[in-house]
Amino acid sequence: LWNIANTLRGKMNADEFRDYILGFIFYKYLSEKMNRYADEILVPDGIKYVEVDEHTESGQEYLEAIRDEALEKLGYFLKPTELFSQMAKRGNGDTEGADNFILEDLKRILTNIEQSTMGTASEDDFDNLFEDMDLTSTKLGRTESAKNELIVKVLVYLDKIDFHLEDTELDVLGDAYEYLIGQFASG
């Protein structure tokens, strides 16, 4: 985690890069939770959530059913292509036929997470959740390409961290948060 902070160090002050890191950690957490939940729903169909083709009629039917259940159970929804791991792969150039420029899509996804909660019990919890993550800030880089490169580095670093969501005894996300807060406080 501290490597991620070091990637942003010197570009902005600690309070600012803390907002980006914690925002991306939360996006990763929401994505992993969504992916695990959708995978459980799809077990009887023998497919994984990331395998659902969003461009087919059957894929749309899956997404609609999963969306309804996810909003009820989790309070938010992400499409397979909006998952953190998929964006990290795409940004890193690991997705065949896809452009590795992800900034615009990432902004849209973070907005979509918040908007997916409209009219649900979780709406207030998600309102302006990612507002402190200004992906257009020149502090991330002078050019769009430089901003994209920096954000991709952060996503790729974070993608390698396993939050152990399957282990309800561990609070890895909470531990990561406390670790970062301690590091920011100490200097």
What are the roles of these predicted feature ranges?
Residues L1-G187:
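Non-catalytic, mostly N-terminal accessory regions of nucleic-acid modification and defense proteins
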